[in-house]
């Protein structure tokens, strides 16, 4: 049958079906809407039967025609097949004209005809496509689709046609082939899919063709491919023998039907690049180079970058010689980064052209500053997480063409999250609604919901975080939440385009901050640093001789006003907190006592005329705060002699505790916890002798406990010993001996170790201090002799007990050797004894003389053998100790002899020079014993009267101008074995009984009570030695160390360097650097 006959036959069939359709529509109008839907089904069945009859007739008539090709050709679909027979133009034209005429006729009744046209015109459309007449095809489709849409035709002109309904027809169902995941060799996914296609083609016409339908290898999936098939056995048959699929032959997983559409879903990731943001190159000679975005072409998927060029000048130079040129080309060498130098290129023979603001060389554009501007594909750059280093920025340019620093920080990677909070005022900085202001209502990840402040916009709007920026106005009170000034608060005084100027509440400085680092707040900054260790206005120590006050807190540094009036910037780790000086006293220009929190006026110096409150006193310097001063937050420093107490006053409580009306300037002497006050008052017969000192009118403290040495019995500082600096009814401030740290402790956790007040106050064992100047040692009360009231031992006529030895033993020896009123020999406590829980005090007893006498006798005279003394050479012996320890050692200050004992008398100014007689250095032994016997004259020496009413005092009384430096090496309790710990190296002292072991070094293996199991290296054996016979080995530089005392006890680290008696240790736990005394460190055994 010819094509014309086919077309005529189809037309007749169409007319018949159209007439049937009209009759069916008349019937439909009579029925209800539900009934009409059911009626369409039999109609469709009749049409299908007619089509089948038509197909069978066509097959019978066309038996001689070659068989048709299958419509679904596997992997490749032919777009157009050319028929073997020649097609006549007139036949196509007739058919086309009939179609066009028919469409014009049926335009009025298109609702009834379009469905039938679609079904009947399928074959005719194939014939239309065979001829390439574009004009008539275009006219045909214009007329067909310009008047009405498919939705209007099918659904009666409804505009509510949803895309979801149309898409449901394309979704896979249970009757469709399934997708199976097959594990593949990574990187070979595409090649494996192609090899499966070739295998499918090869087996297509065999007895066992492959039963799979398709193979999918998505670009973003690594290590897997998807195979479409009805059964898993079909997949196994297809992948058998494919080398890249060996891993997945035994296990294939079926993709759920709901997830099958996601496999082929293409999500194009669009990089949101802005000009002046930073990227890096992925490949080529510019791999990993930093570049700046010049502009982006999203339509062409390209990006223009500004970068530092890499030009091979050697290659240009080698062009002169072809031989060298070919030799150079064999060895590829990545040229270094260097700015474009036009003069050098020309000197090497290169051709440089000019094009406006750019130079052209080898097809590349260079700026006049030497940067390369080149376009790359978007896939050739890395856009996420790009952070230019400081060196790269310096090489790129100091300030690259007005670069916006805010853009740099924004493009430093996705790890920087926004800091928007509900309640923030924001404005839109990008898009169509730019400059629209609003208030944040909610934050959901990167989506910010705001309520716009606009009269025409009443609904909430949602924006991405990058399109918003914080908005502030003048007068807002804000807090800095990030950056250098984090934690500071202040008032906004000026708002500029990219930053905000605010006036700090704390330091009264102007701060320049980015808007994104601010947040509205109502509270004021606490003035405490991030670590909570320091606060604004705190007195800190910069070095052993310099202190200062923190006037500005920053994230990593402090600004400190030192005692000389200079503001220095230091790191947090470089300062240490100064101990509390609230009770320090100084003298102003009119000899008034001034204290902390007093209001004073400055009458001299650079700050003359100012008035302020004293915050800190240190030596002769006072740190003052003035609310009228803006600089340094109102803090300034001046000398105390430049001050005068506001309103003036007489010396406070001076007559109660000073001699002759003298007001001491030293804060330590005037301190109520000092033993001199109690001793002096007791010595003068006041009823409060030894009661704890004077009071300055600040009666909130418990004076009974202040100054005592106590041991902490509970808590984290259990076992530590210190001196009570201040006390109330419930708590006490204790300065620890081991760490020089002052802490607050509950009084119920304290036990008194000893009393340091001379003046008759009894302690636990009836001893006042211990040795030295104690009145009673054993027994209780105030029994001056040793046993009861027996001054002579046997009868009442013998004043000296044995011979001329009045103070033979410790009991009746008020001082050690010289008189009780000898101002030249205060005889401080000599040493601690293990049978009494008494550690040496926090402060040594002051000397009654400034120059000439004993300026500071050592508090512990002899170091106890059980104490780990690292530097014993710094322990001068206490005067007067020879008689106490039955030795023949001498002291040039207190060793009177019968031949010529010298007893100094204080001059009116008490600035005399001690000059002992030459004979005073000889020790004459008593017939009764081998004890040095002091001359009787020593106990009868009377000092000359002083014009200022000065008289000799109890040892330890204050003296004008006397000073009390701390004794070196007295920071560790002598009878303590707390330093003993495992794994440290020790040395056996000469006090150990076994002489073969003495002097050997070893390592402590274990500690039980006071006994240590020590492995001796030399003798290669383990011995048990008491801790009192051991001493730790001092570590040296780069040694592994272990902290043996203090709050960091048991911590390990590496000793990096040594500065005097201190060592800088890098701790193993937190990698922090700490400065510790070498006596607190033990040397670990090297691995």
UniProtKB/Swiss-Prot annotation:
Keywords: Acetylation, Activator, Isopeptide bond, Methylation, Nucleus, Phosphoprotein, Repeat, Repressor, Transcription, Transcription regulation, Ubl conjugation
Result of changing residue 681 to K: Increases promoter association and enhances transcriptional elongation
Modified residues (Omega-N-methylarginine): 681, 696, 698
Effect of residue 251 to A: Reduces the affinity for Pol II elongation complex
Documented effect of changing residue 579 to A: Reduces the affinity for Pol II elongation complex
KOW domain segment(s): 273-306, 420-451, 472-503, 594-627, 704-737
Matching CDD domains: KOW_Spt5_1, KOW_Spt5_2, KOW_Spt5_3, KOW_Spt5_4, KOW_Spt5_5, KOW_Spt5_6, NGN_Euk
Record region (Interaction with SUPT4H1): 176-270
Residues bound to DNA: 619
Phenotypic consequence of residue 582 to A: Reduces the affinity for Pol II elongation complex
Residue positions where Phosphothreonine is found in the record: 775, 784, 791, 799, 806, 814, 1034
Similarity annotation: Belongs to the SPT5 family.
Protein name: Transcription elongation factor SPT5
Taxonomic classification: Eukaryota, Metazoa, Chordata, Craniata, Vertebrata
Gene name as annotated: SUPT5H
């Amino acid at each position: 049958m010819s094509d014309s006959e086919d077309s005529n036959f189809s037309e007749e069939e169409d007319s018949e079906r159209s007439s049937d359709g009209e009759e069916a529509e008349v019937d439909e109008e009579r029925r209800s809407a539900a009934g009409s839907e059911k009626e369409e089904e039999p109609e469709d069945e009749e049409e299908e039967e007619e089509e089948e009859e038509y197909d069978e007739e066509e097959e019978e008539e066309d038996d001689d025609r070659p068989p048709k090709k299958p419509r679904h050709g596997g992997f490749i679909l032919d777009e157009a097949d050319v028929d073997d027979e020649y097609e006549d133009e007139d036949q196509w034209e007739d058919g086309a004209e009939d179609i066009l005429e028919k469409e014009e006729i049926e335009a009025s009744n298109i609702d009834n005809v379009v469905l039938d046209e679609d079904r009947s015109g399928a074959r005719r459309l194939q014939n239309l496509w065979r001829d390439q007449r574009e004009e008539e095809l275009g006219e045909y489709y214009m007329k067909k689709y310009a008047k009405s849409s498919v939705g209007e035709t099918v659904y009666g002109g409804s505009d509510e046609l949803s895309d979801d309904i149309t898409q449901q027809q394309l979704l896979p169902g249970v009757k469709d082939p399934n997708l199976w995941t097959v594990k593949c060799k990574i990187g070979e996914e595409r090649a494996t899919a192609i090899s499966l296609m070739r295998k499918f083609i090869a087996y297509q016409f065999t007895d066992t063709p492959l039963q799979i339908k398709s193979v999918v290898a998505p670009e973003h999936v690594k290590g897997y491919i998807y195979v479409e098939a009805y059964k898993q056995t079909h997949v196994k048959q297809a992948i058998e023998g494919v080398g890249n699929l060996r891993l997945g032959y035994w296990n294939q997983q079926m993709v759920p039907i709901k997830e099958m559409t996601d496999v082929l879903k293409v999500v194009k990731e669009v990089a949101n690049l802005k000009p002046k943001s930073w990227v890096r190159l992925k490949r080529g000679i510019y791999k990993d180079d930093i570049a700046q975005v010049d502009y982006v072409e999203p339509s062409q998927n390209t990006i223009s970058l500004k970068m530092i060029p890499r030009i091979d000048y050697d290659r240009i130079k080698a062009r002169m010689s072809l031989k060298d040129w070919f030799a150079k080309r064999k060895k590829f060498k990545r040229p270094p980064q260097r700015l474009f130098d036009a003069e050098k290129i020309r000197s090497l023979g290169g051709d440089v052209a000019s094009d406006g603001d750019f130079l052209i060389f080898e097809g590349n554009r260079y700026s006049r500053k030497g940067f390369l501007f080149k376009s790359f594909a978007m896939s050739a750059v890395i856009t996420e997480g790009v952070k230019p280093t400081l060196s790269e920025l310096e090489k790129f340019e100091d300030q690259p063409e007005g670069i916006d620093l805010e853009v740099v920080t924004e493009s430093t990677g996705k790890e920087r999250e926004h800091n928007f909070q509900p309640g923030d005022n924001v404005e839109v900085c990008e898009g169509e609604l730019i400059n629209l202001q609003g208030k944040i209502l909610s934050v959901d990840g990167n989506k910010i919901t705001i309520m716009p402040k606009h009269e025409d916009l009443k609904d909430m709007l949602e924006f991405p975080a990058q399109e918003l920026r914080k908005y502030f106005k003048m007068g807002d009170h804000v807090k800095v939440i990030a950056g250098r000034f984090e934690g500071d608060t202040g008032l906004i005084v000026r708002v500029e385009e990219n930053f905000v100027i605010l006036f700090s509440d704390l330091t009264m400085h102007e701060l320049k901050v980015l808007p994104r680092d601010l947040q509205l707040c109502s509270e004021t900054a606490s003035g405490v640093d991030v670590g909570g260790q320091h606060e604004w206005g705190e007195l800190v120590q910069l070095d052993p001789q310099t202190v200062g006050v923190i006037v500005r807190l920053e994230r990593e540094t402090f600004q400190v006003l030192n005692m000389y009036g200079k503001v220095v910037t230091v790191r947090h780790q470089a300062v240490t907190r100064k101990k509390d000086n609230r009770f320090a006293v100084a003298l102003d220009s009119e000899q008034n006592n001034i204290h902390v929190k007093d209001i004073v006026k400055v009458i001299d110096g650079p700050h003359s005329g100012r008035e302020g409150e004293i915050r800190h006193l240190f030596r002769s310097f006072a740190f003052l705060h003035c609310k009228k001063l803006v600089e340094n937050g109102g803090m300034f420093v001046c000398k105390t002699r430049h001050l005068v107490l506001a309103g003036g006053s007489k010396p406070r409580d001076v007559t109660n505790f000073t001699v002759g009306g003298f007001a001491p300037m030293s804060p330590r002497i005037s301190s109520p916890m000092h033993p001199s006050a109690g001793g002096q008052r007791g010595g003068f017969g006041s009823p409060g002798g030894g009661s704890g000192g004077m009071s300055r009118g600040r009666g909130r403290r418990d004076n009974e406990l202040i100054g005592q040495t106590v041991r902490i019995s509970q808590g984290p500082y259990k076992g530590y010993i210190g001196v009570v600096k201040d006390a109330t009814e419930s708590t006490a401030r204790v300065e620890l001996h081991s760490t020089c740290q002052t802490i607050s402790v509950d009084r119920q956790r304290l036990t008194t170790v000893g009393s340091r007040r001379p003046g008759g106050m009894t302690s636990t064992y009836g001893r006042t201090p211990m040795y030295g100047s104690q009145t009673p040692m054993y027994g209780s009360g105030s029994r001056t002799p040793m046993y009861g009231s027996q001054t002579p031992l046997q009868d009442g006529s013998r004043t000296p007990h044995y011979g001329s030895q009045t103070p033979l033993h410790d009991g009746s020896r008020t001082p050690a050797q010289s008189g009780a009123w000898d101002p030249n020999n205060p005889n401080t406590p000599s040493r601690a004894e293990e049978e009494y829980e008494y550690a040496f005090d926090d402060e040594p007893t002051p000397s009654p003389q400034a120059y000439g006498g004993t300026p500071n006798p050592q508090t512990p005279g002899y170091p106890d053998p059980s104490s780990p003394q690292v530097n014993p050479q710094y322990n001068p012996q206490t005067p007067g100790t020879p008689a106490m320890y039955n030795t023949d050692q001498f002291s040039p200050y207190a060793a009177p002899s019968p031949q010529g004992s010298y007893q100094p008398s204080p001059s009116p100014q008490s600035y005399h020079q001690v000059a002992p007689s030459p004979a005073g250095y000889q020790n004459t032994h008593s017939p009764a014993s081998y004890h040095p016997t002091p001359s009787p004259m020593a106990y009868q020496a009377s000092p000359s009267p002083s014009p200022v009413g000065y008289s000799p005092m109890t040892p330890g009384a204050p003296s004008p101008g006397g000073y009390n430096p701390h004794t070196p090496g007295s920071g560790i309790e002598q009878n303590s074995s707390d330093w003993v710990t495992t794994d440290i190296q020790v040395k056996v002292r000469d006090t150990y009984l076994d002489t073969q072991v003495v002097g050997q070094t070893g390592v402590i293996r274990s500690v039980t009570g006071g006994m240590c199991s020590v492995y001796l290296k030399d003798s290669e054996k383990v011995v048990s030695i008491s801790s009192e016979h051991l001493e730790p080995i001092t570590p040296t530089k780069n040694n592994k160390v272990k902290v043996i005392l203090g709050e960091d006890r048991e911590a390990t680290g590496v000793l990096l360097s040594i500065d005097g008696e201190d060592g800088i240790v890098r701790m193993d736990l937190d990698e922090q650097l700490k400065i510790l005394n070498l006596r607190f460190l033990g040397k670990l055994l090297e691995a």
